[in-house]
């Protein structure tokens, strides 16, 4: 229609057609006034009302364009619906006007229409981004404000984000985020936030120079701007490369976020904690959060009655607790009781998982901290809950118990609490992780547990078939790691030299049959196997340290054979057809590096030789959650 008007107004035919054109415009004005008087019953997005608006939009008369733009803005303010190209074309034409009033009203109308999801896509597909970018560069603040607001709405649709990022809009958006006009600043930071939901767009945003602008605006007096910037930075911090850039260029970021956890706005507090949580994926930030006073506000948020605050704080503390240097500061700051209380927070299993994982992290490397966690009542709470919580929480709880059970000083106390009564049923859980963690915890408890092994005898046949049924299941498992932990656990129980335990094991035909079957398997060669830590090398770490290389399948099978034969020796039943003339407890060499007994090695199961220390570590790392999160 624009080209038709141009031809109608050409000099050659001006006198013939100008009166007709002006009459058409006058009729459109009259019609529009009538429609506006009856707006409650008029559909402006079709038929004659839309035709009248279209005529005025494509007029060369700026006053008529203003009328059309203002009408579109007013109509779309009251009613938003999915529209077609016949509605968007005149609005987009008005958007290209050189008149600031027309630009302002047209961008307001387009922003209103862009609330509808289908309209968002159509605006972009019809080329709406280019005139909006031009308007963002306008010196008129009102025009800037509406154009940025429209971009913000368009950017909420995932299919538009990439096109917006590639359109050249990010640089002017970043510049306008520093506007002195709070409305423009608010819209611009909101648009930048909407562009942080994919890795590709985040990288383009960082390239556009958004990071220093977003960080500087954390100190904005406007709550919405604080929220948008905090959330945008939280999303940006998901990427390791971006965290590195933040660490290099923004030394005051952590302090600003810690301060925002004390904001008057709950949503700002929440996002500040989440931003710190994402930053705390890196050890540098884990330490900085503690250094700059982050624990106090995090503890306060844990005590909140508002779920999003509890969840964000729990997630943040979990990551902060990963660093060994933070274990004691967290405990000394009073986190144990609130974390233990959150174990029963059945409104949200994610909160429960974060709480128990934090406790596991805090217990990872310090005997003192393990003792403090048990003394604070964590084990009693776990025992009361673990059979009824969701599987994900069970997995974390059993992993935590397995870590606590590594402490020789705590084993008698844990056994006295009756922890085996809940661990045994969980070895038959539908979750492989829960099975493994529970078995690892039982294995840890069985090693050097105490002189009194009565707690193990008490659960030999119950609950759920007891320790006996669990060992039978694991010995016959297709998973060699499960076989491994079962035979290792039996060795620990036998080496306790408890008469009743030994008789229980010896008098179980199915148990002995399974052991004999495992003992018959020929140990594999280590040829071609991966190198392992030298068990006699102190730098390789103790049995509670991380055993990074672990065992190959062949090595694991060799260890199982050695341990199974050791069990037969300790029970004095022997392999079928073999003669065992020596008594249990003799110094029997255990296969080292996957070799069979009797090949010159001197490690002894009875003294928990270094080879089995490495074995123990590998099993614990594989099954017990072996310490802290990563």
From Swiss-Prot:
Keyword Membrane: yes
GO annotation, cellular component aspect: fungal-type vacuole membrane; membrane raft; Myo2p-Vac17p-Vac8p transport complex; nuclear membrane; nucleus-vacuole junction; phagophore assembly site
Compositional bias ranges of the Polar residues kind: 598-607
Xref: SUPFAM superfamilies: ARM repeat
Annotated stretches, region: Disordered: 519-558, 572-630
Subcellular localization(s) per the UniProt record: Vacuole membrane
Biased composition (Acidic residues): 543-558
Lipid attachment, kind N-myristoyl glycine: 2
Cited Gene3D superfamilies: Leucine-rich Repeat Variant
Membrane topology reported for the UniProt record: Lipid-anchor
Record carries keyword Disulfide bond: no
Any one Gene Ontology molecular-function term assigned to this protein's record: identical protein binding
Record-level GO BP terms: autophagosome assembly; establishment of organelle localization; nucleus-vacuole junction assembly; pexophagy; piecemeal microautophagy of the nucleus; protein localization to membrane raft; protein localization to phagophore assembly site; protein-containing complex localization
Keywords, sorted A to Z: Lipoprotein, Membrane, Myristate, Repeat, Vacuole
Residue windows of the ARM repeats: 74-115, 117-156, 158-197, 199-238, 242-281, 283-322, 324-364, 408-447, 456-495
A Pfam match: Arm
Record SMART domains: ARM
Record function comment: Functions in both vacuole inheritance and protein targeting from the cytoplasm to vacuole.
Family: Belongs to the beta-catenin family.
Name used for this protein in its record: Vacuolar protein 8
